[in-house]
A protein has these predicted regions:
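Hydrophobic transmembrane alpha-helices and their helix-loop junctions in integral membrane proteins
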Residues: 1-33, 42-356
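Short phosphate-coordinating micro-motif centered on Lys-Gly-acidic
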Residues: 38
Length: 356
């Protein structure tokens, strides 16, 4: 961001986003959570459209705002139904009120999941996330890796006692939507040539893993024992770390080569050794190679999936293998393939020094 116009504006928007996200996490009831949820959406819109002189950035920010608002309508209706029948917005309402509500509570929780699916870019509401890469790369690292896009996963996890007791079939829906999203996004990531779009579809796929982990953890599956819930939250934390590292590495590379296209890169390990090492570590982590963090969180998710259903277990294993394929395709294309375009040595060194 050095030398960018609107530096103060960037930090103002970033502070608003951080405040909104912290508020969402510490909210003590579902309505308070919704207020901060919407503030996160507004600050995301402002950050994605930071380069407001670029038509692509303006279009991307509008797309993200409209798609997530559409999903949030479902979230709001779900909150209102829940509040009416539970007679409170608390995360821990009286059991008698929920039992008396009958099928309305599963309906409310299903609608809340629609809101979470929009924020977490689940199929078919995933369309905004790849375009959201128009924002500054540090924003991509924070919003589209570590925090905002996993807000939907956090929502399902926060309401988890209600899901597991009153809407276990909705959790199955969460698992199936997550599995399809993970497979679809991984297959698209395998053929992308834009470095940030590969990471965007990778993020969608990994969020699918988290949703599957939560979804397979139901009272209808007595052998599960809460492993899926723990694994989903564990993967949320590990993914935040290695995906933020990947995005910051991508920003360093883009700054050096002035292009997002992998065709403009190749052989950069000689010119950007620090970026090369950090990017490799993040690739090993997301691919699930031991002893990196991704191995432990994905291992727990796959264990939970196999306990739920062997079919689900094998599907997620294939998707994990696809993750390793597209990440090492990206890594090889950037750092080891034959160099296709000139990169200024001074520029690469400047970018490297920024790491120190």
């Amino acid at each position: 961001m050095k030398g960018e116009k609107g530096f103060q504006r960037y930090y103002a928007f970033l502070s608003l986003f951080t405040m909104s996200m912290l508020g969402l996490v510490v909210a003590t009831n579902i309505f308070q959570m919704y207020v901060f949820w919407e503030l996160v959406g507004v600050s995301s819109y402002l950050l994605i459209g930071f380069y407001y002189t670029k038509k692509e950035a303006i279009a991307a920010s509008k797309k993200a705002f409209i798609v997530t608002r559409f999903a949030d309508l479902g979230f709001l209706i779900g909150i209102l139904i829940y509040g009416y029948y539970a007679e409170t917005f608390s995360f821990t309402p009286a059991a008698s009120a929920l039992v008396a509500a009958g099928t309305m509570i599963p309906l409310a929780l299903g609608l809340m999941f629609v809101g979470g699916a929009g924020k977490s870019a689940m199929f078919p509401l995933h369309i905004w996330l790849p375009d959201a890469m128009e924002g500054p790369t540090p924003v991509s690292a924070l919003i589209h890796a570590a925090t905002m896009v996993v807000a939907g996963v956090y929502l399902v996890a926060r309401m988890f006692p209600l899901f597991i007791d009153y809407a276990p079939h909705v959790l199955h829906l969460v698992a199936y939507v997550g599995a399809f999203t993970a497979f679809y996004a991984a297959s698209v990531a395998c053929v992308q040539s834009d470095i940030k779009r590969v990471l965007a579809f990778s993020t969608i796929s990994q969020i699918g893993f988290m949703m599957v982990a939560l979804g397979v953890c139901t009272s209808l599956n007595p052998h599960e024992g809460g492993l899926g819930y723990m694994a989903g939250m564990f993967h949320l934390f590990t993914h935040a770390m290695f995906k933020a590292l990947l995005f910051l590495g991508a920003g360093s590379i883009i700054h050096a080569v002035h292009s997002n296209e992998m065709s403009a890169m190749g052989g950069l390990r000689k010119y950007m050794p620090v970026t090369h090492i950090t990017f490799l570590i993040a690739c090993l982590a997301i691919a699930g190679i031991p002893p990196f963090s991704g191995f432990f969180s994905k291992d727990e998710i796959l264990t939970a999936c196999f306990r739920f259903s062997p079919v689900m277990g094998w599907i997620m294993t294939v998707i994990a293998a696809m993750t390793a394929f597209y990440m090492f395709r990206l890594y090889y294309g950037i750092f080891w393939s034959d160099r296709k375009s000139a990169v200024s040595d001074e520029h690469a060194q400047d970018t490297e020094h920024a790491h120190h």
